[in-house]
């Protein structure tokens, strides 16, 4: 399995499985002399960790991160930073039933066909539990971006199923109520939508089913010039990073698929001596950041781990009926907000370091 790393100058490599002893990552390229401790990383992990609300999986993990290397006397040394999180609340017995069966909609079938072996306990390496280390690495990137460049990377949930936020609450990026986002379990800026989300999730849990979601990531104060045309365009790398998150099925930059119905006279972001008039492009032009806020949206599918019986096959290609046991999120999009922030921050810092290495 060769796809465990992302980034060039700021590079993150993760390892570990859902029901293994621990999860870990190596972060290369962190500049020296940045103050760093576990306390800088833990808050983002706490936002992602399971068992924090009645709307997510009941699996409980403290997700306490430990820095193993790359920090001396409270400051980064410029060498590889090793991070580890111990797994604690595994219940592997929940998965004994599917040792020889493929959960429909999961990676079970493709992992088995590709490698001839798979860790069936909670999905092993294919589990979203792996993303804890992305969030840990992303917290380091977010701290450096904020302290050295004033760049803020934040996200919010905009839709679960057919319940959407009022678009007026996010029409002006500079006026998004980030305190409201931080104060509810859905990372949502619209208190009315929060009520609707809660009602929908309670209904789904009663039915033993799941639902998809859409979320948005906003990066503010990004300077002009990030991105390496033609193949390493900033939007291409962002799409790559965001699509690598479990359950993500679509990525939009700026207006995304809405551009299909727009005319050129509407979509083009006109300019005046005072700056851009609009931001349909989502802060990226020609694969290079324009200095406007970078806006990306992702859509996540409903998890296939549900209590509703479904048809599948076993290792012998025989028909079976499957009900997924274990503890699962009714909507994986809820805990994906800090993950999407992390992946965005990792890409932005990587491109900032590349920009500094070759440009004025």
Curated annotation (Swiss-Prot):
EC code: 4.2.3.5
Cofactor(s) the record lists: FMNH2
Catalytic activity from the UniProt record: 5-O-(1-carboxyvinyl)-3-phosphoshikimate = chorismate + phosphate
GO cellular component: cytosol
Alphabetically ordered keywords of this record: Amino-acid biosynthesis, Aromatic amino acid biosynthesis, FAD, Flavoprotein, FMN, Lyase, NADP
One of the protein's GO biological processes: amino acid biosynthetic process
Subunit note: Homotetramer.
Residues holding FMN: 125-127, 246-247, 286, 301-305, 327
Protein's UniProt keywords contain Lyase: yes
Job of this protein: This reaction introduces a second double bond into the aromatic ring system.
Pathway(s) annotated for this protein in UniProt: Metabolic intermediate biosynthesis; chorismate biosynthesis; chorismate from D-erythrose 4-phosphate and phosphoenolpyruvate: step 7/7
Family the entry assigns: Belongs to the chorismate synthase family.
Residues the entry annotates as binding NADP(+): 48, 54
PANTHER family reported in the protein's UniProt record: CHORISMATE SYNTHASE
A Gene Ontology molecular function term of the record: FMN binding
Cofactor, free-text remark: Reduced FMN (FMNH(2)).
Name under which the protein is recorded: Chorismate synthase
Organism: Actinobacillus pleuropneumoniae serotype 5b (strain L20)
């Amino acid at each position: 399995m060769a796809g465990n790393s992302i980034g060039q100058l700021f590079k993150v490599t993760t390892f570990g499985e859902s029901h293994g002893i621990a999860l870990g990552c190596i972060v290369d390229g962190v500049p020296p002399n940045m103050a760093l401790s576990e306390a800088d990383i833990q808050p983002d992990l706490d936002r992602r960790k399971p068992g924090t609300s009645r709307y997510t999986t009941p699996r409980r993990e403290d997700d306490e991160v430990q820095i193993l290397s790359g920090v001396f006397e409270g400051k980064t040394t410029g060498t590889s930073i090793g991070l580890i999180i111990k797994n604690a609340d595994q219940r592997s017995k929940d998965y004994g039933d599917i040792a020889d069966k493929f959960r429909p909609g999961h990676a079970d079938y493709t992992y088995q066909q590709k490698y001839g072996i798979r860790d069936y306990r909670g999905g092993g390496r294919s589990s979203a539990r792996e993303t804890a280390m992305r969030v840990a690495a992303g917290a380091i990137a977010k701290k450096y971006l904020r302290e050295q460049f004033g760049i803020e990377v934040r996200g919010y949930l905009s839709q679960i199923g057919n319940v959407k936020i009022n678009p007026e609450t996010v029409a002006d990026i500079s006026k998004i109520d980030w305190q409201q986002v931080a104060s509810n379990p859905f990372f949502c800026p619209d208190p009315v939508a929060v009520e609707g989300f809660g009602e929908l999730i309670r209904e789904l849990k009663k039915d033993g089913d799941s639902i998809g979601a859409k979320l948005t990531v906003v990066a503010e104060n990004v300077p002009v010039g990030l991105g390496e045309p033609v193949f390493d365009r900033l939007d291409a790398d962002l799409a790559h990073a965001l699509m690598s998150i479990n359950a993500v099925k679509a990525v939009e930059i700026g207006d995304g698929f809405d551009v299909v119905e727009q005319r050129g006279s509407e979509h083009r972001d006109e300019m005046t001596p005072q700056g851009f008039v609009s931001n349909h492009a989502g802060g990226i032009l020609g694969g290079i950041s324009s200095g406007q806020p970078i806006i990306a949206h992702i859509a996540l599918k409903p998890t296939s781990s549900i209590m509703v019986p479904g048809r599948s096959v076993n290792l012998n290609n025989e028909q079976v009926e499957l009900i997924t046991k274990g503890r699962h999120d009714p909507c994986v999009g809820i805990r994906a907000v800090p993950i999407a922030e992390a992946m965005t921050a990792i890409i932005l810092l990587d491109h900032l370091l590349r920009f500094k290495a070759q440009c004025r």
